[in-house]
A protein has these predicted regions:
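Hydrophobic transmembrane alpha-helices and their membrane-interface boundaries in multi-pass
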Residues: 44-136, 154-157
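Hydrophobic alpha-helical membrane segments of integral membrane proteins
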Residues: 127-129, 141, 145-154, 169-173
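Transmembrane helix interruption/hinge and helix-loop junction motifs
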Residues: 64-65, 120-122, 141-146, 165-169
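N-terminal membrane topogenic signal
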Residues: 34-46
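Non-catalytic regulatory/interaction regions at protein termini and inter-domain linkers
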Residues: 1-37, 129
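Perimembrane helix-loop-helix junctions
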Residues: 161-162
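Transmembrane alpha-helices of multi-pass eukaryotic membrane proteins
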Residues: 69-73, 99, 144-149, 178
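Juxtamembrane or sensor-core-proximal signal-transducing alpha helices
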Residues: 175-185
């Protein structure tokens, strides 16, 4: 009896993590619609991000306090433009490459938050990363296990960077925030 309950619980967990609670057949049937929606979102988010990075780069040129951020925003702009160009060249039905491009976009956003929150501002709290940690999983439809893996990966990278680059007075608060916001995400 106990083995049966455990097996049922494992099946429910597998169904939840791999198929978002749906039946595998239903999940497979809606994948084309999910990819079309993700592609539209990726195009919109990349275009918005590029416009935002242009504004940040130009704005940083005008504010002496932000001069150090110019290369970071310029690199993010170049990466965003590159991803946008690749996305526009993809055939409509190439799902696997689209997924990799979604991961690359998420990685770029997380990396920007980690870099700005740890290396660029070692004596301040890393608020940008926590905002990205909460928002990025909501941008695209993916299997829940992939969202969880991404959050754990980048939260772990952030924690390593915090202990490596941050001022000792800020480390406890950033570690606590990373654990709380990582769990929420």
């Amino acid at each position: 009896m106990e083995e049966m309950i455990t097996r049922e619980q494992m099946e429910k967990l597998k169904k939840l993590l791999l198929y978002a609670g749906a039946e595998p057949e239903d999940f497979a049937r809606c994948q084309m619609d999910v990819q079309i929606a993700n592609r539209r979102r990726l195009t919109a988010f990349l275009g918005t991000a590029c416009a935002f990075f242009v504004a940040l780069t130009l704005g940083s040129c005008m504010v002496p306090l932000l001069y150090d951020h110019i290369p970071v925003f310029a690199v993010a702009l170049i990466v965003g433009l590159g991803l946008l160009a690749v996305e526009q060249m993809l055939p409509q039905k190439l799902g696997l490459f689209l997924n990799w491009e979604i991961y690359a976009f998420g990685a770029m956003v997380y990396a920007l938050g980690i870099y700005l929150g740890t290396v660029q501002t070692p004596d301040q709290r890393a608020t940008a990363f926590f905002a990205f940690l909460l928002c990025v999983p909501m941008l695209f439809m993916m299997r829940p296990i992939l969202h969880i893996a991404n959050v754990l990966l980048f939260d772990g990278i952030f924690l390593v960077c915090v202990t490596r680059f941050k001022d000792w007075r800020v480390i406890p608060m950033d570690v606590c925030n990373a654990l709380v916001f990582g769990a929420i995400s």
